[in-house]
UniProtKB/Swiss-Prot annotation:
Any single Gene Ontology cellular-component annotation: cytoplasm
E.C. number: 3.1.-.-
Enzymatic class: hydrolase
Protein name: Ribonuclease J
Species of origin: Sinorhizobium meliloti (strain Sm2011 / Rm2011 / 2011)
Binding site for substrate: 375-379
Cofactor binding notes: Binds up to 2 Zn(2+) ions per subunit. It is not clear if Zn(2+) or Mg(2+) is physiologically important.
Molecular function per GO: 5'-3' RNA exonuclease activity; RNA binding; RNA endonuclease activity; zinc ion binding
Amino acid sequence: MKKAKAHHDMAQDEELVFLPLGGVGEIGMNLGLYGYGRPGHRQWIMVDCGVTFPGPELPGVDLVLPDIAFLAEQRRNLKAIIITHAHEDHYGALNDLWPGLNVPVYASPFTAGMLEAKRAFEKSRSEIPITIFKQGDRINVGPFSVEAVGVNHSIPEPMALVIRTQLGTVVHTGDWKIDLEPSLGPLTDESRFRQIGEEGVLALVCDSTNALREGVSPSERQVSESLAKIIADAEGRVGITTFSSNVGRIRSVAEAAEAAGREVLLLGSSMKRVVDVARDVGLMEGVKPFLAEDEFGYIPRDKVVVILTGSQGEPRAALAKIARDEMRNVAFSAGDTIVFSSRTIPGNEKAINDIKNGLIEQGIHIITDSEALVHVSGHPRRTELQQMYQWVKPQILVPVHGEAAHLTAHAELGLQSGIPSVPRLRNGEMLRLAPGPAEVIDEAPHGRIYKDGTLIGDFEEMGIGERRKLSFAGHVSVSVVLDSRYDFLGDPDVVPIGLPEFDDEGEAMEDTLYDAVLGAVESIPRAKRKDLAMLQEAVRRAVRSTTNQVWGKKPVVTVFITKV
């Protein structure tokens, strides 16, 4: 009887928790952990493993990844990683972080293909074994039973997850929308969500991206019709730039081009990789082969459509090269049309406007989503969110995938819609979903790490603070050689990098700094110059002070003093 009571007490201690390490309080870098068991003995599954992209405040950084230090002690208790879809903010960190985790990965055929294509392109040494997991499948992982439910989004084969445990069922939506006329893939599975709702849902962990927008998102089919009309009516070449992962839109454009008697050229390596994967899994059946780039010049202007990367102003993408007239085999002319079939991601406005201006200077006609319905979001607006609430009838709503404004608006909508519990949650906070009321019970290490080239590290390890200083005020290198009497042996060597060439009186900056170095050393008696560290610091301070006087900024200064 004692053993039975002990087992009962242990069972009573078991908890179901949700711990986001990214994507809650920000857009991007989505990574969520579900844990089950007693504190200190929980087993975990990871849902998604995404990146976000650096802004100008992170000079030189290529990608921003979630810090998974929390999992260092939980590595043996992490049972699986499940990827909901192949957008960078949901799967982009997996190739870099998986070697430190080495656990089974579950993903759809398209997502698995994208992971392999990404690994090959990045020349990653880690070959991730992936188990195919698609709409309608169920897997048992430790204390979790996970079902994939089909949803609609702006990429092939997205899925929501139904995570069942002894303490209740969680619906994790991933990215989704309700589109009754999608251009590719099935509808969001209303029937299955309703069935799951009838079974009883403890918590809905739900996309908040468009929680500030009223109504229902327009259909992708409407975008297809709008693009088809633009292509049919255009007199010259047509270029359409969109997100490279939007296979449905690429396919729609290709079909519209064929209907208008036009050939299609794909430009951009990322888009070509996506289309190759889509072909491999059967998503491009019936679409004619695309032109080779060197065939472009032989096609009449009114017989070609170019689908190209660069909708976010990426300087090395195909569209930016077109705007700068730098492409070898492809160019647009006055009277041609380029359509921005995309939204502007915050932070990219200037880069996109620069490209638009470059195109307009060439006489190219620009069409954006402010002039025509050429883009729709892949995320649910408020009416769609309320529809999901009605389908699954959750006891708890956990808004995720959004910044503070999105999460707050989503929470208010949930409460207005009658959901009993809507806890506030941010990255690193451990939310107990059951037993008892939903509440934050702990905080885990969380944050960001940075990928630069082939290296990954934290803010200090990657020298980002120093880079910021360098980008703001440049660098001065000073080399001083002293003889046995601690006098100058030759002239000091002063090399300013990234500083103005002249001060406001026309004096060369290098000469001004040279004088500062001489003055700093000569102001110190010979006997005290033996303290090379003190002398080094005196020179550094003198150079920074002088540049501050003549320029108003203090550069990074590196001083080398050698005594021979």
